[in-house]
Each structure stands twice: as structure tokens, then as C-alpha cells.
Swiss-Prot record:
Coiled coil: none
GO MF annotations in UniProt: damaged DNA binding; zinc ion binding
Gene (name only): RAD14
Ranges annotated as unnamed zinc finger: 191-216
CDD domains in alphabetical order: DBD_Rad14
Protein's name in the database: DNA repair protein RAD14
Any one Gene Ontology cellular component term annotated for this protein: nucleus
Places the protein is found: Nucleus
Miscellaneous comment text of the record: Present with 1030 molecules/cell in log phase SD medium.
Lineage: Eukaryota, Fungi, Dikarya, Ascomycota, Saccharomycotina
Amino acid sequence: MTPEQKAKLEANRKLAIERLRKRGILSSDQLNRIESRNEPLKTRPLAVTSGSNRDDNAAAAVHVPNHNGQPSALANTNTNTTSLYGSGVVDGSKRDASVLDKRPTDRIRPSIRKQDYIEYDFATMQNLNGGYINPKDKLPNSDFTDDQEFESEFGSKKQKTLQDWKKEQLERKMLYENAPPPEHISKAPKCIECHINIEMDPVLHDVFKLQVCKQCSKEHPEKYALLTKTECKEDYFLTDPELNDEDLFHRLEKPNPHSGTFARMQLFVRCEVEAFAFKKWGGEEGLDEEWQRREEGKAHRREKKYEKKIKEMRLKTRAQEYTNRLREKKHGKAHIHHFSDPVDGGIDEDGYQIQRRRCTDCGLETEEIDI
């Protein structure tokens, strides 16, 4: 734009603002905001490094003219700017590159997450040799500085102290083996059935807390047989909340024999289940009475279901009979033809023999051709 066009544009802008001010459309705050918005941009120092540089930047900022050829308004605030920067205080509204560079990079949130695009980052992967050799297994105060040297020396063996190894072996022994034998055989616990054998069945002893040997557990299946959860519910009429209560019954869990994805199989010892069932139903007689009551209930429900089916069939038959009667009243009774013996009807134009039959009731005549 030429200087004449700029001057004309500025004059028109001032006239428009004056006209709006006279009409009372614009307030004083709005006028000040418009004036500050239309002022030329003020240059400011890019960075503050030292006292001499700040003075040079301030001096350079004083002599920068605006686009109208007039001195910038920043020259009027030279002293304020110099004192502000000289004191080392940076205004929060002014962006300082030196301050921004000092921000910690770990707090800056990336715009793109790497895990959304990279599933396997080979730069961060570690070679564990199929899971058999882990460099992290070495001790912190180990003499090996290189992981390859550690792997070549120990291989898949985890480096540990003698105390750690003894502690681990003791834990494995307590977990997978029975308790050590007593000091004297007379003090050893004996089987509660035979009172002779001191070697207990590990499953009954460790899981169900019963001092029974293997021979006695096989000779008395009516006491020490293992029952599934379904058998407990069907034979002793126990509910799921009762069987799931760990305070009432000991249980042995195994993988489901039907499928590995099914719920785990739970086994209960018969003597515990019987004792709780007798207490619940009032002894063996009460359990038999409950079984008889449930069998009678099953028979009653079966008979009730049969009667319901018979009733539905009768209603259906009655409705069909009623429909047939309405059809007979409207269209008459359905006629069934009774044809007479065939009579020779001659030969047709194609040379085939024709036989005629006639209904004895309505006189309907049909022709049959023997091909």
C-alpha cells in the first residue's frame, strides 16, 4: 500500500471510532482496547544473557522505528525495561527461550505414543535365550561385568549364596515332602483305624487332616472315599454355598477331567460330608426321609406335567372338532366319492384305451387312460 492509501485508511478508521464514541456504542475500555490493538508491534529482546547484552538490546529497542516512520513507543519505557531486565526478573507474559530450555523433558507429554504404533521395540528387547538364561540373575556384587561372560560361566543356573540355597531346599522339602519321622517310634502317630501303621496316606493326612494309612483307606471306602461336588449334592442334598465354605469341608482340587477350560474338580472325603449331612437332616433316618420326600416330589411333578400335556391335547382336539362343525354348517358336510367299476370308454385319438368311472352318490364321472 502507498503512504497516501495508508493515511486515508487511518483517517477513515479514526472517523469511524469517533462516530461510534459519539453515539455511545463503544465504552472507554473498548476504545482503549481497539487503540492498543491497532498500535504497531513492539520489538523486545530475544534473550537475556548478561548485563552488557541487556543494555545493548535495550538501546537497540529504543531506536527501532515503527512502520509509520515514528519512533516506537518502547522508547518511552526504556528505563522501566532496563531496570526490569537488570534485576534479573523475567515477566511471565514474555516468553524467554533460555527459561523454556531448562524445563525437564520427562514432564513433557509426547504428542504420539510409541506403543500405539510399535508392538515390538527391538531397541529395548533383551535376549534371554528362550527363558533359560537371564542376566538379571547374577548378584549385585558379582565379578562379572559382561552378561555374555556370566552366561558362559553359569549358563541357566541362578547365582545365589549358600544360605539362600539351603533356605530354598528347606522350603521345597516342607512343601513337597512329609514331616520328618519322630525321634522314637513309640511317639509316632498311628492310624486311627488299625492303630499299627505309622505311614499315613499323604492325601488324607495333608489335605483332609486325617491320620489314616493307605491300606485302611482302601479297606474302608464307606468312610474315606473321595466324592465329587455333584455326588455330594445328589446323594447328601447339600447346597453350593455349603460346599464352597472352606470352614466346613476340606477339599482337594484337581484339573477337570472333561476339559481343561472347565472349572476345577473338587473332591471331598465321605466321612466329613456324611457327618455334616447327618447333622443337617437329623441322622441317617432323616436323610432317608428327605430322599423319599424328594422322590415323591419328582413323581408328583412328572404326573403334573403329564396331565398338563393331556389337557393341552384335549383342548386342541376339541378346538379341531369345533372348527370342523363350523365348516360343515357353512359349506356342508365333506363328500367322499364312491366310484363304480371301470367301464370301457373306447379308444381316444392317440390310440389309448379309455376307462370311465362314475360316483354312485353325486354322479361325477372320470376318465382313465392306460398307457
